Amino acid sequence: MTDEGAEARPEALTTPNLLLAALPEAEWALIRPHLQRVPLRRKQVLEEPRTEIQHVYFIERGLASVQARTQADGAHGVGLVGRFGMTGLGILLGTRRATLRVSVQVPGSALRLGAEEAARLMEASATLRRTGLSYIQALMTQSAQLSLCNARHPMKHRVRRWLLLARDWLGEDEVCVSHQLIADLLGVRRASVSEQIECLESEGIVSQRRACITLRDRAALEADCCECHRLVRAEYRRLNLLGAERAAERAAEDR
């Protein structure tokens, strides 16, 4: 089934998704014909617990959250997926069943790959499989570090860390989310998030308009943040995704 608004496969497909951009040429040529660019809508659910995974999404623009949920507590964010990553990780582990909810928080676009095709390609290419498994390790590191941060670090650092990671994953300084969404994903009260962001605004580190936060001084935001953001970035650097990021930025400047 094709998503409404899906675009036709271009003959020469390039992508800002850094996981795909970091692939060797042979593996990119292997996977490229099977990818289809589709829009991502806000609140679109890409995976639901205890249901079969239908597609793998390589996010190009936008932001999705990985959430654990209970009936009593609702959703709690355990990870973010943006231009550095992909969904459908169960397929890499030999299962088609989702265990966590993945939903779009900032709309954008993705390259979509059918689940059966993804499984076949991972089986055919050891390099694709290793890349996917390395990404799973990076996402596990992110989830573990976020759990530690949410449990042990003050609200000031948690909000700063969330904004920095969201900015990295989006690739732009404007993070169009509400205070309520950040609060929901952090598992805290909205007022606590609003207080911290208003402090940042008063210091000139961020500016705000309705449901959008713009990072004005990233260096200042990083200077008074816990080390969790740096540790998560270090794991993605190990995958050479930050090298792909710099190459993409240089290519954009040359155009």
Language-model segment annotations:
Residues 23, 59, 81-82, 105, ...:
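A conserved hydrophobic position in a structured secondary element of the catalytic/binding core
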